[in-house]
Amino acid sequence: MKRIEVLLLGILAVAVGLFGCYYFLVHERIDKVGPEFTVEEKLLEISVKDPEEVLMRGIKAIDDRDGDVTDSILVESIYGINSNQETTVTYAAFDNAGNVSKIQRQVRYKDYEPPRFEAYTTLCFAGGKKFDLLDYVGARDVLEGDIRRRVHATLVSDTENINAEANHEVRLQVTNSLGDTAELTIPVLVYSPDWYNASIKLSENLIYLERGERFNPRNYLETFVVRGDPIDISAAVPSDVSVEVENEVDTEVPGVYVVTFILSKSVNSVTHSGIAKLIVVVE
């Protein structure tokens, strides 16, 4: 009986030993090491207009078993932007065993600008009708283009309802894919329908100017609509149309300004007037 037990224990010991050897050999054959990166330029300088392929410049990946796996490199993320217009790009590379290696480097967009807001109409509305301000404002980004769907609007004036007849102040906010957030507080006028019975169309409704840039507000007048008839005022305002322009824009002082236009025309002894506001951001 004891001999049988000893024999069984011996067989078990041999089996465990053989399994250990097999596991060791198999385990050693499994590739658990990812590729290694080499980067020629620690800081890559590019333009926002460059294609994404430019981000691959000067970066390679070599695997100890598969060799050159540079073709497997992809951009995993681009995030963050500092005052030097530098962002962090994360790269990932893969070998044939599915191992993944990652590396980060700084990329500087030499012509980067934060997102800018747009207004698709003059922000002057006749009271008595509900409207959604986000239908009339948006934002553009130098990298992503149209990002209007990310714009948020918050009423910051004492008025409680954007549809109420009043001079409102609204803060716009938008964030691009880099995490860069732009904010702008703008005026929104909701007037009594009895005040104005004509409309003014501007060529632009929200503009950005560089400090010291020359500015003539009349250059933005486009059309004056009276009783449904459009009057072209882009080149010159007809003599039978009166123009009032309230302009306090100082391009030497950064800030947000508003130019107010009021146009009037008499038809059959009835005066028809319209109002429009141009928002000017001096950077």
Tell where the protein language model's regions lie, with residue ranges.
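Compositionally biased, intrinsically disordered low-complexity regions enriched in proline and serine
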Residues: Y23-F24, G80, A92, K110, ...
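Hydrophobic alpha-helical membrane-insertion segments, chiefly the h-region
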Residues: V14-F24
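Solvent-exposed, low-complexity, repeat-rich "mucin-like" stalks and linkers
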Residues: L25-D66, E113-D146, Y196-S234
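Serine/threonine-rich, repeat-prone extracellular segments and beta-strand-based repeat modules
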Residues: M1-L12, D64-R105, E144-V190, R227-E283
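Flexible, low-complexity linkers/stalks enriched in Thr/Pro that connect modular domains
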Residues: R29-D31, R108-Y112, L189-P193, V281
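A broadly tuned "polar low-complexity/structure-edge" signature
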Residues: P193-D194, E213, P217, L221, ...
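N-terminal membrane-anchoring alpha-helices
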Residues: E5-V6, Y23-V26
